[in-house]
């Protein structure tokens, strides 16, 4: 298009100039304007027409150059595109014209040769152009040179311009395929680049750093490739690093304590350490260092168990310690109380029922004072020695951290444990279990029923679970009465929770060593009598805690602590035992009958375990979770209420002495559903509003 426009414009000029410059007529117009400082159209010796050329200077020059468009034309920078600004095509620009100039210059020689060779053709073409000025102006030349300069120029010019026609497509500025090779933007465009290398002279490269010794530190040295001798290794590292198989040769390492204590079972190296540590809770008394958690394990020596039992079951029994001290007090007496307290508080904290339990120690003190407790304590101590659970360490571990975990994870298990191992006081349970004559004591301790050895720890955990879960929620209700709270708390809190665990554990532990919860679960079966104990605990509910301050303290409070005790229930059953037997007659027990003499279970009887579950679970309507058990002999304790207790998932609240008791164990049976997970929603990517889109597109 541009070419044609140019052609037409030049043709007009040609017509006017045809007379003036015979053969050059077309040339000046087109060439004249386009020549930027060189011969305009380049006709040989054509006189430039002032009109055709934009600058007379150009034409004069051309005239001077006058003649063949050879040299001059080559100089002429084919700017005929620049003839008139209006004529410029869309693709053409000053830059283009400059490019054309370059091209014409480059091809000067070609142009000269062609012009000379094509003189005849030029003349004929010019004639044609003159003849058909209105035609496309030398059609022959028009399309022969692809640079657009052919249109109105005489063939000579066109011949001169034919050079550009031979340009490659990528070199022809007017060709869409033109690849610019100059200019800032295109300096990195390497398409079809042939002379870019020459164009960009490479500056000499300077070394900014020296590479001479660069890899000295890492050089491959043949002499270093052989294995080092032992002497070299020792000189280098201080010991023979290759003698891993020979421990003696290995550099001794400082033994570090595990940062996050792992269970002694897992970390045999620290078992000794751990056990002592665990006993550190036991309190000032060093006698029972293991006892602190041992009982819970039902591990450790019987004595430890016993003392622990006291602390556990009677830990709250600060006063009790005095009684205990009779038997146990001597060894554990002071320690028991203190330790129990520590332990109790420690455990309570653990159990989440801390607040309730902690208070209990004080209230318990009076309760502890009761002779029953004393009896239990004395019995328990003896029993404890019998039950010498050998795994104090393990209990410790479990108590400290497994229990919490378990309580959380095994709510169901805890309930089961409660059924199986109601006794709250593990230590007592274990002690009671061992001594056959200490059924009463056991009862008092509640822990006695539990087999010290069996699964004290496991039971402990299970009980804890139950106690913690069912207990803590309902505990407040049971514990509401200060006394109740105090007593049961005591039991639960001070040592109650621990005792519970102990009891459960001990029930399990009956075998004499700490067993896993599963084992204790199985073990409990042998102890059907336990249910009575459990009942007693439940009955404890019955008794007014106030009424049975001493012996019943637990039972009276039982309601509150019951949940945990519920697990301990069997021991609870025993609970009454010491005082209960004595107190059994006392009216304080709402159901003395229920509370048969502690149903003194045989000391070894783990009945509490069974009893436990049934007992506290059985609390169907009555608070006696172990109601059926009252009359049963320790061994004869009916296994019973358990089923019914499960059925009564929600035992109706019982009101005794103006206190409403709920069976936490039963309440706890239903695990609290976890809140529904929030459905993860992917981040929604929304398209921009249409307005934005339209704006962008527009």
Curated annotation (Swiss-Prot):
**Assembly information from the UniProt record:** Identified in the spliceosome C complex. Component of the mRNA splicing-dependent exon junction complex (EJC), which contains at least CASC3, EIF4A3, MAGOH, NXF1 and RBM8A/Y14. Identified in a complex composed of the EJC core, UPF3B and UPF2. The EJC core can also interact with UPF3A (in vitro). Forms homooligomers. Interacts with STAU in an RNA-dependent manner. Interacts with DHX34; the interaction is RNA-independent.
Q: Motif Nuclear localization signal 2: residue span?
A: 251-259
Does the record bear Coiled coil in its keywords?
yes
Residue ranges under compositional bias (Polar residues)? 137-154, 294-312
Gene Ontology BP terms: intracellular mRNA localization; mRNA export from nucleus; mRNA splicing, via spliceosome; nuclear-transcribed mRNA catabolic process, nonsense-mediated decay; regulation of nuclear-transcribed mRNA catabolic process, nonsense-mediated decay; regulation of translation
Molecular function terms, GO-annotated: identical protein binding; mRNA binding; ubiquitin protein ligase binding
Give the principal location in a single coarse category: cytoplasm
The protein's role, per its UniProt record: Required for pre-mRNA splicing as component of the spliceosome. Core component of the splicing-dependent multiprotein exon junction complex (EJC) deposited at splice junctions on mRNAs. The EJC is a dynamic structure consisting of core proteins and several peripheral nuclear and cytoplasmic associated factors that join the complex only transiently either during EJC assembly or during subsequent mRNA metabolism.
- What does the tissue specificity note say? High levels in heart, brain, including hippocampus and cerebellum, liver, kidney and testis; lower levels in muscle, lung and spleen.
What positions are modified (Phosphoserine)? Answer: 34, 115, 145, 262-263, 360, 370, 472
Please report the PTM annotation for this entry. Answer: ADP-ribosylated by tankyrase TNKS and TNKS2. Poly-ADP-ribosylated protein is recognized by RNF146, followed by ubiquitination.
Where does the UniProt annotation locate this protein? Cytoplasm; Cytoplasm, Perinuclear region; Nucleus; Nucleus speckle
Keyword line:
ADP-ribosylation, Cell projection, Coiled coil, Cytoplasm, mRNA processing, mRNA splicing, mRNA transport, Nonsense-mediated mRNA decay, Nucleus, Phosphoprotein, RNA-binding, Spliceosome, Stress response, Translation regulation, Transport, Ubl conjugation
Compositional bias ranges of the Basic and acidic residues kind: 107-117, 124-135, 155-175, 208-229, 242-252, 338-352, 410-419
- Tell me which SMART domains the record gives: Btz (SM01044)
Residue stretches in coiled coil: 98-127
Kindly name one Pfam family recorded for this protein. Answer: Btz
Region of interest (Sufficient to form the EJC), ranges: 134-280
Q: Name one GO cellular component term.
A: nuclear membrane
**What is the recorded name of this protein?**
Protein CASC3
Give the start-end ranges of region Necessary for localization in cytoplasmic stress granules: 374-698
Q: Where is this motif: Nuclear localization signal 1?
A: 201-207
Q: Which residues carry this modification: Phosphothreonine?
A: 354
Q: Which organism does this record belong to?
A: Mus musculus (Mouse)
Where is motif Nuclear export signal found? 457-466
| InterPro entries cross-referenced by the UniProt entry | Btz_dom (IPR018545), CASC3 (IPR028544)
